[in-house]
Amino acid sequence: MQIDLNADLGEGCANDEALLALISSANIACGWHAGDAATMVQTVKWALERGVAIGAHPSYPDRENFGRTEMQRDPEHVYADVLYQIGALDAIVRAQGGELHHVKPHGALYNQAVRDPALARAIVRAVRDFDADLVFFGLAGSQMIDIAREAGLRVKQEVFADRGYNPDGTLVKRGSPGALHEDEEVALNQTLTMVREKRVRAIDGTWVPIQAETVCLHGDGAHALAFARRIRERLGAEGIAVRAGD
């Protein structure tokens, strides 16, 4: 058994270089919610040195709120936004002799696309038009994944180690009770259950079927690095290999 571990990097956290030793895929901020050209260059360099798969992490133009505030942007504007950000990171990756592997939307853009098919189609179209061989990372079981598949893209269904789930398989909104698992043991057990048993316990206590193909580890927070080490060690102890795959 194997699983991909991904983390959002290039967002101004001090853990990036150390996290790259523990993950298999890196989603690099493209400057619109965090980071800049210099952080993109440095993070790509570190990822290439460690053989970590590199992905673009496009967002709404929202540095003030870290890309976590919902916006009502026209799908054509979103298409252009995403295409622009992928292109910027791809140029940096190619300049260093690497190859872009995937795209994962960030924050509010990601969560709104789970609910809004027009938004999801705009994001997916930008990815496909840029490079139809890129892998699309999206919320496991969501219409965003279905739309990407219908467009002919390869997908990785993403689950979250430290986030709470609603009974419909969506994430509990940040700031709401149960949105984040502060207890590392709870997050570890949730991850193993999702990977091994293909299910997750929702905040109402019900079990929700889920397909875990990549697990997101958040790189921010005081204990992020220690938790990443624990989850990597636990997966190894359970005989689960960590690798990006195709």
From Swiss-Prot:
Alphabetically sorted, this entry's keywords are: ATP-binding, Hydrolase, Nucleotide-binding
UniProt-listed Gene3D superfamilies: Glycoside hydrolase/deacetylase
Give the EC number: 3.5.2.9
Q: What class of enzyme is it?
A: hydrolase
Record's superkingdom?
Bacteria
Q: Which GO terms describe its biological process?
A: carbohydrate metabolic process
Write out the GO MF terms. 5-oxoprolinase (ATP-hydrolyzing) activity; ATP binding
- Output the Pfam families linked to this UniProt entry: LamB_YcsF
The answer to whether keyword Mitochondrion applies is no
What does UniProt give as the signal peptide span? none
Could you confirm whether the keyword Hydrolase appears in this record? yes
Recorded catalytic reaction(s): these are: 5-oxo-L-proline + ATP + 2 H2O = L-glutamate + ADP + phosphate + H(+)
InterPro entries recorded: Glyco_hydro/deAcase_b/a-brl (IPR011330), LamB/YcsF/PxpA-like (IPR005501)
The record's NCBIfam families line, in alphabetical order, gives: PRK05406.1-1 (NF003812), PRK05406.1-3 (NF003814), PRK05406.1-4 (NF003815), PRK05406.1-5 (NF003816)
Known function: Catalyzes the cleavage of 5-oxoproline to form L-glutamate coupled to the hydrolysis of ATP to ADP and inorganic phosphate.
Q: Which HAMAP family match?
A: PxpA
- Family (UniProt): Belongs to the LamB/PxpA family.
Q: How does it assemble?
A: Forms a complex composed of PxpA, PxpB and PxpC.
Official protein name in the record: 5-oxoprolinase subunit A
